[in-house]
Amino acid sequence: MSGFLNAREVAKRMVARERGTIIFTGATASIRGAANFAAFSGAKMALRALAQSMARELGPRGVHIAHVIIDGMIDTEFIRTNFPEGYAKKQQDGILNPDHIADQYWMLHCQPRDAWTHELDLRPWMEKF
């Protein structure tokens, strides 16, 4: 619900200016459910549908809407502390670097309107998909 409410409010100003970017962050669960993840998967799938609908509605009005699927662990203190076996993959570029994710978000924001990306999957090279 927060994705919808926040996007609705900022979209009003962006539509008035005929420009802007809204990026929703999804997960693997945005496209594939898993056992014991029904609530999370349902919410992420709904967020993806919201992004797709808003892209179709607001794109023609100059607002770029993108959905980014983050498919893998992100190098954070939480991961380092709670998932040391996952963090060990860092040595092989096996977890996502937050700065590299930010670079991709900035790239989406800077895209020219004639070549907008509406969905982007970010995953380490060794992550299964």
Predicted regions and their residues:
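Conserved internal alpha-helix in NAD(P)-dependent oxidoreductase domains
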Residues: 1-5, 17-20
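A short, exposed helix-loop element centered on a Lys and neighboring polar residues
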Residues: 7-8, 52
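A structural motif corresponding to the C-terminal end of an alpha-helix
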Residues: 9-10, 112
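Helix-to-beta-strand junctions that scaffold the AdoMet/dcAdoMet cofactor pocket
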Residues: 14-17, 59
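Catalytic loop of short-chain dehydrogenase/reductase
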Residues: 21-46, 51-52, 56-60, 74
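Short beta-loop-alpha junction of Rossmann-like oxidoreductase domains
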Residues: 36, 63, 67-82
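C-terminal helical subdomain
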Residues: 60-69, 87-129
